[in-house]
């Protein structure tokens, strides 16, 4: 079986290409960086195409383009969980093995592979961290929590402050979309469970996994996680945190550079996410990779762009301008970076502890099944055990097919 790859005659063609990614929250910093490329290579200009801010809709747009053989998209940004699906369907081409940059974190590089071949190059990795309202904790004279029990106690203490009795404790992204999959996976993994174990076996109905789901269900029931969070995606949760509706927030690092400037550094801080029952928090690995579409006409320019977009210079730029987590380990310890972005060591520790979402060619079906089963449990319409058992049956069917 011959998969499409970047070898042979078509590698010589150079001309204009497009770079396709989700919505840019950085206030035009992506375009600014592309302007540098366009000045340097006027015959191989890159135009930016921004898709939705939502992962599920981005994926749909990319699939529609691939299925209609559209040549509009050349280099595309893929959530790392989509790589297998796009490679298996031959919507993206194999990348030459010598593309791997020196110093890239190995586990991050591997997110671009499918069946032992490389189909995508990471340009940002990602793991969540805990944002906390420093101002509220100081008013209540409370330490930064290290455990789930501490989070509960800190929330109770802050609720005793004047006009604070209704503040939410711990926020996240619990709307019915990809964020829900990331958030529930963290509770399940932290409690010692797994949706699918390393051998590919469905284990979402194990006692440990059910405990993880139960912990989230209980947090909604007790209003530790505010009910409003059932509608929250990334930006909603950031708004909730900024406007004082929630004390702690699990979110990705992009929020630090792009949005919290208005809140001011004296009002918020970043810390590791809390352990649950003595088990260290297991963050969900995020990140985006760039891949070259099979329909791309100018594959030589596309590959040259991918190498430039994932170079150390570009990664440093995207770290400074968008607080994107870089793919190179050394950028997390570089003195001037840590001075500017003091959360980097916390983020690196989160990345090192992070676990991927289930690997599946039919990832779209897997994540939809997770959302369909878990959401009603969080709403209190069904219990954790029933949700887990229903999900296990559904996942077994998807994986078998």
Locations of the language-model features?
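Glycine-centered hinge/linker elements that transmit conformational signals in sensory
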Residues: 155-157, 199-230, 273
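Long, aromatic- and glycine/proline-rich binding clefts that accommodate carbohydrate-like moieties
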Residues: 10, 111-112, 268-271, 320-369, ...
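Conserved C-terminal helix/tail region of periplasmic/extracytoplasmic solute-binding proteins
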Residues: 138, 221, 349-401
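Hinge/lid segment of periplasmic solute-binding proteins
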Residues: 78-127, 140-143, 152, 163, ...
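Extracytoplasmic "Venus flytrap"/periplasmic binding protein-like
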Residues: 33-107, 111-113, 135-146, 240, ...
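Short, solvent-exposed loop/beta-turn-alpha elements that line the ligand-binding surface or hinge
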Residues: 93-104, 162, 168-178, 191-211, ...
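Single conserved hydrophobic/aromatic residue that forms the stacking wall/gate
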Residues: 1-8, 13
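Short, well-ordered beta-strand elements
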Residues: 10, 14-24, 44-51, 74-75, ...
């Amino acid at each position: 079986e011959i998969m499409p790859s970047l070898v042979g005659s078509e590698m010589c063609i150079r001309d204009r290409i497009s770079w396709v990614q989700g919505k840019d929250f950085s206030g035009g910093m992506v375009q600014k960086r592309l302007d540098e490329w366009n000045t340097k290579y006027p015959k191989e200009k890159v135009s930016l195409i921004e898709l939705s801010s939502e992962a599920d809709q981005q994926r749909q747009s990319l699939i529609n383009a691939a299925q209609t053989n559209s040549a509009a998209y050349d280099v595309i940004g893929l959530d790392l969980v989509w790589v297998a699906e796009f490679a298996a369907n031959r919507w993206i081409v194999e990348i030459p093995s010598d593309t791997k940059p020196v110093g890239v974190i190995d586990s991050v590089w591997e997110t671009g592979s499918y069946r032992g071949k490389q189909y995508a190059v990471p340009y940002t990795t990602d793991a969540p961290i805990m944002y906390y309202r420093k101002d509220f904790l100081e008013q209540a004279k409370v330490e930064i929590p290290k455990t789930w029990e501490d989070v509960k106690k800190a929330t109770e203490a802050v609720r005793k402050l004047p006009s604070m009795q209704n503040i939410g404790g711990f926020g996240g992204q619990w709307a019915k979309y990809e964020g829900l999959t990331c958030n529930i996976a963290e509770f399940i993994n932290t409690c010692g469970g797994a949706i699918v174990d390393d051998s590919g076996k469905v284990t979402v109905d194990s006692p440990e996994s059910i405990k993880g789901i139960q912990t989230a269900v209980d947090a909604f029931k007790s209003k530790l996680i505010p009910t409003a969070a059932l509608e929250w995606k990334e930006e909603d949760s950031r708004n909730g945190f900024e406007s004082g509706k929630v004390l702690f927030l699990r979110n990705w690092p992009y929020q630090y550079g792009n949005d919290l400037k208005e809140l001011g550094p004296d009002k918020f801080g970043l810390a590791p996410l809390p352990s649950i029952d003595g088990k260290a928090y297991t963050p969900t690995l995020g990140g985006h990779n760039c891949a070259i579409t099979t329909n791309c006409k100018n594959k030589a320019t596309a590959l040259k762009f991918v190498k430039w977009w994932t170079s150390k210079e570009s990664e440093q730029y995207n770290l400074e301008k968008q607080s994107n987590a870089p793919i190179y380990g050394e950028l997390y310890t570089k003195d001037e970076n840590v001075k500017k972005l003091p959360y980097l060591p916390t983020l690196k520790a989160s990345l090192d502890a992070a676990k991927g979402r289930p690997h599946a060619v039919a990832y779209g079906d897997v994540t939809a099944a997770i959302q369909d089963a878990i959401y009603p449990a969080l709403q209190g319409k069904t219990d954790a055990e029933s949700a887990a058992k229903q999900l296990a049956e559904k996942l077994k069917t998807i994986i078998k097919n």
